[in-house]
Amino acid sequence: WTLSLLLGAVVGNEVCYERLGCFSDDSPWAGIVERPLKILPWSPEKVNTRFLLYTNENPDNFQEIVADPSTIQSSNFNTGRKTRFIIHGFIDKGEESWLSTMCQNMFKVESVNCICVDWKSGSRTAYSQASQNVRIVGAEVAYLVGVLQSSFDYSPSNVHIIGHSLGSHAAGEAGRRTNGAVGRITGLDPAEPCFQGTPELVRLDPSDAQFVDVIHTDIAPFIPNLGFGMSQTAGHLDFFPNGGKEMPGCQKNVLSQIVDIDGIWQGTRDFAACNHLRSYKYYTDSILNPDGFAGFSCASYSDFTANKCFPCSSEGCPQMGHYADRFPGRTKGVGQLFYLNTGDASNFARWRYRVDVTLSGKKVTGHVLVSLFGNKGNSRQYEIFQGTLKPDNTYSNEFDSDVEVGDLEKVKFIWYNNVINLTLPKVGASKITVERNDGSVFNFCSEETVREDVLLTLTAC
C-alpha cells in the first residue's frame, strides 16, 4: 500500500502523491470548454522539477537544491534575503540563458536568492499535456516554500515567484497552495490556450499572492493570430506595453517567428512569436531601470496614444516589472489597467514627456521639432506638430524618449517648411513648456525667430 502511494495510485480519474497530494481530471481542471481533454498531469518524477539556485555569491554557476533541509543548509541560500523563483514556459528550460541573466541583473541591485525552476521534462510535450503538468510544478514550488517555512522559519511573504507563459500559471498554482501567503507573483504574458476564461482555481489570479502584477505582450487571439498570451486581466496591476499586441521590433509575419520543429526540440528560446518573449525581456531590463517603465492608468491604449492619460495621478505611476511593488496603490483593486510604450531593441526603457510650444513669427506650413537638455542627458529631436503654423497658437504632443533627461535646463526648437517659400519666413517659439510624468513642469522662453532648419535655444523663463 505504501509503495503504491509513493508511486502514485490512480483511482478512477485521480492520482495521488505522498508529498504533493491528489490531482484529478474533474472540472474545472479538465472536461470544460477551454480544456476539453480529460488529461491528468504527469508524475512528479516524470515532470522532474529542478531548483537551480543562483546567489550573489554564485552568480554564474547554479547550485541544485531539493526540498530537503540538508541541501538548502549546505547551499548559499540565505534566509536573511528575499527569494525570487523564475519559472519558464512551454518548450523552454530552466538552464536557458534568459533566466540566469534575469538573476544576474538582480544581483547588480540587491542581495537575493534567485531560483530558476527547470521543468523541461514536463514542458517539452503536447501543449495540452504541458498545461496540466504546471500543476505539478506549482505543487513542487509550494512544497519547497513550505519546507523553507517549517525548517528555517522563512516567511512566504519573502517569496516572489516570476513565471513566463505556462510558468505564470505554475506560479499561480504555487501561490494558491500556500493560501495566497506568497508575497508576490509576477505573470510574464500568462499563457492563453487552456487558461483564458477558466475559473480562477485553474489560472493565475489576484488571490494567489499578496500582490500579483502581470505584463501582457501577446494578447491577439490564439486563433487565428497565434497570440500566446492572455488578454484578460490576471493581477492587481495589469500592464499592456505598446497596447499588448504588437511589440516594436517584432515582425508581424507570424510564420517567420516559428522555427522549424527540429529547432523547437533543441530547446531554442524562439519557439514562439517574438511578442510573447518580450515580456521577460522587459522585466529583465526593468531591474536596471527603476523609473524607465512608468505605466499610465488609462481606459484603453487608444486613449493613451491620444494623449489622454498624462501625467501620473497624485499617487504616481507604477513601474512595470521589477519595481511594481513600490506603487502605493498596488493592491487597492484588481485588474487595474496601465499602458506605456517601450523601445524596439535591447534598451527597452522609455521616459514620457509632454511638450507645449507657443509659436511666434510668420504663419507658414511646416513642422516643429523639439529636443530636451537636462542634468541627466539630452534627447533627440521629437516632432510636436505638422501642418499650418500660426503665431500665438500653442501646439502640444507627448513622446517617449529613450533618454531620461532629468531636470530640464534648456530646450532646442527647429522648424522645417513643407513647401519652397521664397520669402524666407522666420518662426520662433515664444514659450515651450515641458512636463514630466511626475507632473513637474519646466518653462522656457525666447523672443527670437529663426529661418527653417536653424536651431533656436530656449532657456528658462
Curated annotation (Swiss-Prot):
Residues 1-12 form the signal peptide. Coiled coil: none annotated. Inhibited by bile salts, is reactivated by (pro)colipase/CLPS. GO terms for molecular function: all-trans-retinyl-palmitate hydrolase, all-trans-retinol forming activity; lipoprotein lipase activity; metal ion binding; phospholipase A1 activity; triacylglycerol lipase activity. Pfam families: Lipase, PLAT. Changing residue 165 to X: 80% loss of P-nitrophenyl acetate hydrolysis activity. Ca(2+) binds at residues 200, 203, 205, 208. Its EC number is 3.1.1.3. It comes from the Eukaryota. Residues 351-461 form the PLAT domain. It is found in: Secreted. Belongs to the AB hydrolase superfamily. Lipase family. This is Pancreatic triacylglycerol lipase.
